[in-house]
Amino acid sequence: MIVSSKMATRSPFGILDIGSSKLACLIAQRSSANDILLLGQAMHAAEGVKQGEITDMNKFSTAVGKTVSAAERNADITISTIHIVTPGGNPAVTKHVQTIDIHNQVISRRDIQRIAHANSHLKLPVGHVRIQNQPGLYQLDDQRQIENPLGMCGRQLSLQFSQLSVSQTSYANFAQAVQQCHLELGSIHHSAVMACHACLTEDDRELGTLLIDFGGGTTSVAIFSEGQLRFAGTIRMGGLNVTRDIARMLSITISEAERLKAIEGSVLPTITSAENPVSYTHLRA
């Protein structure tokens, strides 16, 4: 389980994964040994949300409340804070390089703290709010790829930041929805970025990897390279679009099309081809 700094607490907390077809809630707690203990979980049909965005506040907040309540019953515990994972919010990754002068030529801890806090006023896309800020490697004068410049000599120290931001409107609406469930919004995370942390190795993120999270109503993507998040985005098409296309082409119900897709469908061309067509008998009158 990936836990952000805002989740680093001894109190139980919830993680709500918002999909187009279902909501999933996990309740966890950090143990005295610094492990993450899973206490409870629950799923519920998604309502009032489409393609990662809230379309009906009342229906969505009700569905969230039912999902969290079921997870609380499963865990036999009550939570006050929830962290959201969603493909929505029109995510954007921006990169900034911050540079400071080194007055005494030797880099101190104060210099490192100074450059780390210098990113608080960096610009974001219009109408966006920052949800993640990741520092990269340092540069000291013309020397690049420095992991820890403490004690080194130089005149200027630079540090690149990768910032992930989402629409302020989406953020505010998610916060409003959980507040209606008497919960506090701890943080919001992009689904593909969280999938990268869960699925990719350190080598994957260092060498360069594109991860595609194919959901029901959206397809989320994230790119890591040299250990840094380079891109995150969401396409408002997913598995439900494929299901509807099958239903239209074969004149069958959505449930029949979903079953056919699950049994016969494949994204690998080596498994299916024109030489091995799928047969389907239409049984309805």
Task: Give a label for each model feature.
Residues 207-245:
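Glycine-rich phosphate-binding loop of actin/hexokinase-like ATP-binding domains
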Residues 247-251:
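Long, well-ordered mid-to-C-terminal structural blocks that present hydrophobic/aromatic surfaces
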Residues 1-20, 26-210, 228-230, 239, ...:
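Nucleotide/phosphate-binding catalytic cleft detector across ATP-hydrolyzing
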